[in-house]
Amino acid sequence: MKFFFYYFILSIFISLYTSKTPYDDLLSWGKDNSLFISDKLGMRYINENNKSYYALDDIPENTLIMDIPYDLMLNRVKAFKLLDNKKLEKTYEEFKKLKFSIDVGFLPASLEQAFLAYILLYVTSKPKYYKKTKFYEYFHYLIDTFETDLDSFPVFFTPSQTQLLQGSLALIDTTLLKELYKEEANNLEKISNKKSFDVDEYMRYRTLTTIKTLNITNITSIVPFIDMFENDPIDYNVNFKLNETNKNIFVFTTHPIRRGSTLYIRSGHFSNNKRFVIYGQTFEKTKDYIEAFQIPMISLMLQKSIKVDDENFEYDESIDLVKKKFYKNALKTYKKLSKYNKEDGSDISAYKLFLKNLQMSREIYDKTTTSDIHREFVKAKDINNVIRVLTFEKNYMDEKIGVLKKFIEKLEKEGNKIKDKKSKENKNQDL
């Protein structure tokens, strides 16, 4: 009897030791697709929405621990192509013709598809006016017009893809989106005279008209290894470098890491989509400006995903007023900065305007109450983490505002010196 008992215990230990972790398939898949991952880096499975990366051995400062090709994105339509501005230009022209909201991540294949997507966006944003809207008569044509192939919709992952995405933001986002779409479909069905769609079909088309489907935040998290873009920024042990030429992302350690220490963790349901409102202004990347105000990697990537260059751009009514105002201010900033070419540094109005926009963004945080956070992140499991990150953002903003103020003062002093010098030269010439 004892023999069987010990045999049973031993078999359990053997099975635990030899069983695959949720990330064995992920690591194997990555290495088969040109991923480099240091043999000193390990992954811990926390639950389906959380995972962490830790040091298997001591790691020196500035050590390359990952080299991630863009091609490892699980998005079926290779969403990294959205980073290519050339591809965006033609689509953006179609958007402008339709006065289509830039808040929509869908890039239509044709003008007809863009028009129908606009209808769907309008109707779903104004459900109580569903019957009254002039677009109502077109609504049922959506089913026949859009592609029905699920390969076109990155929200719908295959079982094998879902396994690879265990612990990533993309997986929990898609789950929450599906719940949201089902709720929308049921609400529309209640106020409609006839049923124009079923829930599954509606979910596919609704996928086309939400920023949370194809925006840069979700694109990066669809790469199973790049959930560090969504990590808690309070404890950065790693740094990222975007290699645009080879389309790779390098991950380095920022300081010596001890064996067993966590390098970064993907925790909770907090998205960086707010950072576009705060930092994502397009600007002329002059050397001095970059040194004075380094914008996070996520914002630099966002600038490539959304092109804002039309001062007459009209926004759909469903766009948040704060975003609407901020986009326009950011556009003005870009236009000002693009004209910054005076050697004497006298034209610093662009930087002052940027500072004003930055301060305005900071005020948005002050007006954000705890109830606002609970409402926006109502399904978040860790509200305290959200509040903690927002607090970090406030401090980060204050720091950068201070740096930018000093930079402006420096420009003013240098400009005044040059002006004084030129003034003296002119006086000497007059004499």
Where are these regions (language model features)?
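Proteolytic processing junctions in secreted/extracellular precursors
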Residues: 18-19, 431
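Well-ordered mid-protein domain cores that form the structural environment of catalytic cofactors
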Residues: 33, 81, 85-158
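Short acidic, low-complexity intrinsically disordered linear motifs used
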Residues: 426-430
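Long, positively charged leader/targeting segments at protein N-termini
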Residues: 20-72, 76-81, 127, 136-422
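Cleavable N-terminal signal peptides of Sec/SRP-targeted secreted and luminal proteins
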Residues: 3-17
